[in-house]
Amino acid sequence: MSTSTQNIPWYRHLNRAQWRAFSAAWLGYLLDGFDFVLIALVLTEVQSEFGLTTVQAASLISAAFISRWFGGLLLGAMGDRYGRRLAMVSSIILFSVGTLACGFAPGYTTMFIARLVIGMGMAGEYGSSATYVIESWPKHLRNKASGFLISGFSVGAVVAAQVYSLVVPVWGWRALFFIGILPIIFALWLRKNIPEAEDWKEKHAGKAPVRTMVDILYRGEHRIINILMTFAAAAALWFCFAGNLQNAAIVAGLGLLCAVIFISFMVQSSGKRWPTGVMLMLVVLFAFLYSWPIQALLPTYLKTELAYDPHTVANVLFFSGFGAAVGCCVGGFLGDWLGTRKAYVCSLLASQILIIPVFAIGGTNVWVLGLLLFFQQMLGQGIAGILPKLIGGYFDTDQRAAGLGFTYNVGALGGALAPILGALIAQRLDLGTALASLSFSLTFVVILLIGLDMPSRVQRWLRPEALRTHDAIDDKPFSGAVPLGSGKGAFVKTKS
């Protein structure tokens, strides 16, 4: 940028169409967060009406994880072939229809299927909205685009909690799901009123349709075995998260089977760049493993170990959720200032200073605990707002929506594993110590994976002929693309 351009406030670099594109995607992501937490809010009411066991009730939450990876793949491929806008609109309609179906569900099976549909739509919304906004904004503002967008999810969760308190006591739990019709109306408005992403339009102007991840996996020479592996992965995930398996060896075996299938899909779809894709799945997996024990078990910790009443628990959780939302926006500024990877590492290192005090001070001072949680979540959880920008930079425009959607939502299975890990450790330690230990140790794994740019580094080690040296989104160099000690001149920009 020129000196005169740098003196212009960042928000003036955006035209009306770009702001409209962001606003539409942000609202879509807010609705995604809204729909995601509805089942958790009314789970006890649903369990009581349908006569479900605790395991069956919990499986309604896990159902979304079972289908997310496939939704990311399918709707991401739609975004790569037909445009980000259509994929985003389709995702919103899909999770809205699933939410509406939950309201009409006569029993467990119907609601479980509806939750599978919601999971697919959620996954597609993440990949399509993120790529849509990032590719619509100027390159030097794309960390802000990513961070601001992801903040919508936290806002949606807060809105859902408020709507729950107003609707359910008066009209019952089904009325909360009937609100799912509203996003469909919003999606129809989007279809007519927002432009296509600039990067996608430029890449596809006058060119033949690209070969998407769906084409490679389900229309290629290995389509039969890939279809069988898809059903095998879905069945394995169902048994792991909803089948009430008690044998740890069987669960581990099914998890290993899923890992082999997902890596196989990545190898087939990414070609020589499969090491990058596999490492990105690991980055996301550990990102969920360090953050989700606190997300899932913090309410339990506050109620059981600190003996807080429900009102106090709600207040503390507000600090936590609001901190994460603010952190997404702060992360966007940090990313554009320091660079995506450096901002991620610095923010996580700062969060490490706070994680031990959060669980060490006890519950004597609610305000101090709330403030500590606010800043810890702002730095540790909020920085994940620029994760779509980080992942998307490793993929060309032709494969970005499916690549981002698939890698993120496979890694997101860590969100289902994390509470289990926390609970297992809590059998030997108190819950607060378990959460602090798990988060503190696994955060360092993410710091190393991102700080050392392991996706590029492993790519260079295994398949150097397909190495990308520069970020495909903002053209900044990848530190792991050259051996340690090499000068800046070693960077040779690859063709995107």
Curated annotation (Swiss-Prot):
GO cellular component: plasma membrane
GO BP terms, alphabetized: carboxylic acid transport
Record field: transmembrane: 22-42, 58-78, 86-106, 116-136, 148-168, 170-190, 224-244, 247-267, 278-298, 313-333, 353-373, 374-394, 406-426, 431-451
Keyword Transmembrane applies: yes
Reactions accelerated catalytically: N-acetylneuraminate(in) + H(+)(in) = N-acetylneuraminate(out) + H(+)(out)
GO molecular function: carboxylic acid transmembrane transporter activity; sialic acid:proton symporter activity
Keywords, ordered alphabetically: Cell inner membrane, Cell membrane, Membrane, Sugar transport, Transmembrane, Transmembrane helix, Transport
Membrane topology reported for the UniProt record: Multi-pass membrane protein
Keyword presence, Cell inner membrane: yes
Pfam families: MFS_1
Compartments where located: Cell inner membrane
Family assignment from sequence similarity: Belongs to the major facilitator superfamily. Sialate:H(+) symporter (SHS) (TC 2.A.1.12) family.
Main function: Catalyzes the proton-dependent transport of sialic acid.
Protein name as it appears in the record: Sialic acid transporter NanT
